[in-house]
């Protein structure tokens, strides 16, 4: 009830399950959506994967693997997108979080982590810490970021 009430108060439109199921839209080319959140001294990260077309049965990408696609702790939060196998092999989000713990600013972390990925590997990252917020991607990825303040 809390989330639904908040969404309605923000002007979000409601639709029935039938409307969602019968849009006729092809969802085979979906993308990952990620966010990092700061609420005072608390941080969180969330990801929703679009997956990949023609995945090998049983494939597990970076999103459900904590420390790979996302990570958060008392110092900040990280969310990544792109080539899931490359992100998972590098434990990307956890390693980026370690840079937060070492006192690095998010604006410095983003290009540092992007450099871990060789072209043409698609990669993007968003980082928030007590020192600020930053996001970026290599040339293989389109991305956008938004910073908002919500008062409840």
Where are these regions (language model features)?
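N-terminal nucleophile
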Residues: 1-152
